[in-house]
Amino acid sequence: MGSAESAEARRVSFEMDEEERVRVLQGIRLSESVVNRMKDCSQPSAGEQLVPGFGPSSSAPVPTVPLPAISVPTVPAPTTPVPTAPSSSVRGLPGGTCKGPLTDVKVPSAESGGGLQSSAVKEDLKKFQQEQLAVQDEMVRVAKKEKEAAEKHLKASLPKKKASLTHEQQQSARLARELEDREAELSRRDTFYKEQQGRIQEKNAELYKLSSQQFHEAASKAESTIKPRRVEPVCSGLQAQILRCYRDHLHEVLLCSDLVKAYQHCVSTARKG
């Protein structure tokens, strides 16, 4: 286009106004229709989302995009669209790419952003699953270690318990034998004491019988040798008087002294006679 009317194509550059919109191409004023098209192209679609790292909030420096060589005819026609410079999306500003022969710069779309988010979620899920598996493995390892320690402790304490049990059984058997021996000794002594007691009782019975027999024989012999004799009391009258005097004079017993002297004289006389 324009090659038939212009024998030579020249390179052009663009300039921007305060709103960063292309207005001038090497001193050539753009038409209003071209400006409107650029406005329409620079508006982002409703379903389009900002891609992380490509918006204006990104702190990365914006690379300088060289302007491609565009052939411009010497006599521009108002109805013919003139090639425009790259839109703000090429410079890193938010917005979509314009449909036109401007540049071939590829910007990540919403689908690519969703893919990045999905991959990030998958990575997080994979990391979480790996951590969970690691925790489960650690728990299994700890449980196995505790089980091994318990089994080891049980195995170590089992011989001691067995030896202690054997010792207790031996001691119980020894004590049982000693108890049986003690019971047998007590039974033997009980039998011996009963025999001795029986013998002593028999001997005592024989002695009692013999002593009783001897006593009766001696009593019979004494009765046969000793003759009985009647004895009358001596001075019985004086005895009665003395007792009556003492009874009547409890606090004056000296009053009975004459009776006592008479009783003594009577007894002496009876002994002499």
UniProtKB/Swiss-Prot annotation:
<dbReference type="GO" id="GO:0042407">
    <property type="term" value="P:cristae formation"/>
</dbReference>
<dbReference type="InterPro" id="IPR042860">
    <property type="entry name" value="MIC25"/>
</dbReference>
<feature type="disulfide bond">
    <location>
        <begin position="245"/>
        <end position="256"/>
    </location>
</feature>
<feature type="region of interest" description="Disordered">
    <location>
        <begin position="73"/>
        <end position="118"/>
    </location>
</feature>
<keyword id="KW-0496">Mitochondrion</keyword>
<comment type="function">
    <text>Component of the MICOS complex, a large protein complex of the mitochondrial inner membrane that plays crucial roles in the maintenance of crista junctions, inner membrane architecture, and formation of contact sites to the outer membrane.</text>
</comment>
<feature type="domain" description="CHCH">
    <location>
        <begin position="232"/>
        <end position="273"/>
    </location>
</feature>
<feature type="region of interest" description="Disordered">
    <location>
        <begin position="150"/>
        <end position="181"/>
    </location>
</feature>
<dbReference type="InterPro" id="IPR010625">
    <property type="entry name" value="CHCH"/>
</dbReference>
<dbReference type="GO" id="GO:0006974">
    <property type="term" value="P:DNA damage response"/>
</dbReference>
<feature type="short sequence motif" description="Cx9C motif 2">
    <location>
        <begin position="256"/>
        <end position="266"/>
    </location>
</feature>
<feature type="lipid moiety-binding region" description="N-myristoyl glycine">
    <location>
        <position position="2"/>
    </location>
</feature>
<feature type="modified residue" description="Phosphoserine">
    <location>
        <position position="33"/>
    </location>
</feature>
<keyword id="KW-0999">Mitochondrion inner membrane</keyword>
<feature type="modified residue" description="Phosphoserine">
    <location>
        <position position="13"/>
    </location>
</feature>
<dbReference type="GO" id="GO:0005739">
    <property type="term" value="C:mitochondrion"/>
</dbReference>
<dbReference type="GO" id="GO:0061617">
    <property type="term" value="C:MICOS complex"/>
</dbReference>
<feature type="short sequence motif" description="Cx9C motif 1">
    <location>
        <begin position="235"/>
        <end position="245"/>
    </location>
</feature>
<dbReference type="GO" id="GO:0005829">
    <property type="term" value="C:cytosol"/>
</dbReference>
<feature type="modified residue" description="Phosphoserine">
    <location>
        <position position="31"/>
    </location>
</feature>
<keyword id="KW-0597">Phosphoprotein</keyword>
<comment type="subunit">
    <text>Component of the mitochondrial contact site and cristae organizing system (MICOS) complex, composed of at least MICOS10/MIC10, CHCHD3/MIC19, CHCHD6/MIC25, APOOL/MIC27, IMMT/MIC60, APOO/MIC23/MIC26 and MICOS13/MIC13. This complex was also known under the names MINOS or MitOS complex. The MICOS complex associates with mitochondrial outer membrane proteins SAMM50, MTX1 and MTX2 (together described as components of the mitochondrial outer membrane sorting assembly machinery (SAM) complex) and DNAJC11, mitochondrial inner membrane protein TMEM11 and with HSPA9.</text>
</comment>
<dbReference type="InterPro" id="IPR007964">
    <property type="entry name" value="MIC19/MIC25"/>
</dbReference>
<keyword id="KW-1015">Disulfide bond</keyword>
<keyword id="KW-0449">Lipoprotein</keyword>
<keyword id="KW-0472">Membrane</keyword>
<comment type="similarity">
    <text>Belongs to the MICOS complex subunit Mic19 family. Metazoan Mic25 subfamily.</text>
</comment>
<keyword id="KW-0175">Coiled coil</keyword>
<protein>
    <recommendedName>
        <fullName>MICOS complex subunit Mic25</fullName>
    </recommendedName>
</protein>
<feature type="disulfide bond">
    <location>
        <begin position="235"/>
        <end position="266"/>
    </location>
</feature>
<dbReference type="Pfam" id="PF06747">
    <property type="entry name" value="CHCH"/>
</dbReference>
<feature type="compositionally biased region" description="Pro residues">
    <location>
        <begin position="75"/>
        <end position="84"/>
    </location>
</feature>
<dbReference type="GO" id="GO:0005743">
    <property type="term" value="C:mitochondrial inner membrane"/>
</dbReference>
<feature type="region of interest" description="Disordered">
    <location>
        <begin position="40"/>
        <end position="59"/>
    </location>
</feature>
<feature type="coiled-coil region">
    <location>
        <begin position="130"/>
        <end position="189"/>
    </location>
</feature>
<dbReference type="Pfam" id="PF05300">
    <property type="entry name" value="MIC19_MIC25"/>
</dbReference>
<keyword id="KW-0519">Myristate</keyword>
